[in-house]
């Protein structure tokens, strides 16, 4: 994989986090969202691996779409069975992710270099980190998914001064600051943002 592709994928990954800000208000939601994202990603890789050996090239994208959507539905049903209240918050975002992947497969030609495990790993870590920090700042606790809703494992009085940082607007602003720092730190090694695109 080229250095150009990895840098571009990393930047797009950071921008994409903004789409999931409403779903990362608690660590429990962020954790299940990251697991769903990985289920979607690896089901897509599995479909591509199987299609290389058992299917023709023209039918491979359709097989990948079907397996990806099936994996998303199975994961959604699994969450509904164990964590029904949390599932109500995450369901739209799980299927938005699956639909985005489906449109990507249907409307664009597949490029093997565009798939980056680094990007997927960074995306998952940042989603989990953002949800953890937001819940600590806003509610003064850390929660895990439970059948009755949320199980609090750490609790302390939240700070009213920095609570704004845990809201949707505050999180987007924080992501923008982190992205600016990320880009500024890389200026010594990369010519410019325009040159990477």
UniProtKB/Swiss-Prot annotation:
The chain crosses the membrane at residues 12-41, 78-100, 120-142, 162-184. Its main location: membrane. GO terms for cellular component: plasma membrane. It is found in: Cell membrane. Keywords: Cell membrane, Membrane, Transmembrane, Transmembrane helix. It is a multi-pass membrane protein. This is Uncharacterized protein TP_0149. The lineage of its organism: Bacteria, Pseudomonadati, Spirochaetota, Spirochaetia, Spirochaetales.
């Amino acid at each position: 994989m080229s250095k150009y592709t990895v840098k571009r994928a990393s930047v797009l990954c950071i921008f994409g986090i903004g789409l999931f800000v409403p779903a990362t208000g608690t660590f429990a939601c962020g954790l299940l969202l990251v697991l769903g994202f990985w289920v979607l990603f690896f089901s897509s890789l599995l479909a591509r691996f199987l299609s290389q050996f058992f299917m023709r090239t023209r039918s491979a994208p359709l097989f990948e779409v079907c397996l990806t959507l099936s994996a998303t539905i199975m994961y959604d049903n699994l969450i509904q069975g164990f964590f029904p209240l949390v599932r109500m918050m995450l369901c739209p975002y799980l299927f938005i992710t699956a639909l985005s992947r489906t449109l990507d497969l249907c409307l664009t030609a597949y490029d093997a270099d565009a798939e980056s495990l680094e990007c997927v790993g960074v995306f998952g870590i940042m989603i989990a980190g953002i949800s953890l920090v937001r819940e600590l700042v806003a509610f003064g606790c850390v929660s895990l998914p439970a059948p009755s809703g949320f199980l609090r494992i750490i609790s302390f009085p939240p700070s009213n001064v920095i609570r704004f940082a845990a809201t949707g607007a505050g999180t987007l602003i924080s992501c923008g600051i982190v992205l600016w720092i990320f880009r500024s730190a890389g200026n010594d090694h990369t010519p410019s943002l325009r040159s990477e695109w």
